[in-house]
Amino acid sequence: TQYIRFFMDSNRYTAFEAFVNQYKEIEVFHKVSGQACYLLVSHFTDVTFPLFIESLSNWGRYSVETFVADKLNHGDD
């Protein structure tokens, strides 16, 4: 799982949103306020993720956090 914060380099929001919505691997696609313009949660493979990021970089800048392990413990053990 990848968590992507995306920062637009232009105001072509509608075209960018159409681009992102082409990908079935994207589970969450939110327009946000704060540091980033959008927050995405995706499930690309190690092979397809670099291809997506290369295309994404045509639209702006991004930062990526990759899911490693769920550490939430509600004491149910």
Sequence positions of predicted segments:
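A compositional/biophysical signature of low hydrophobicity enriched in polar/charged and small residues
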Residues: 1-77
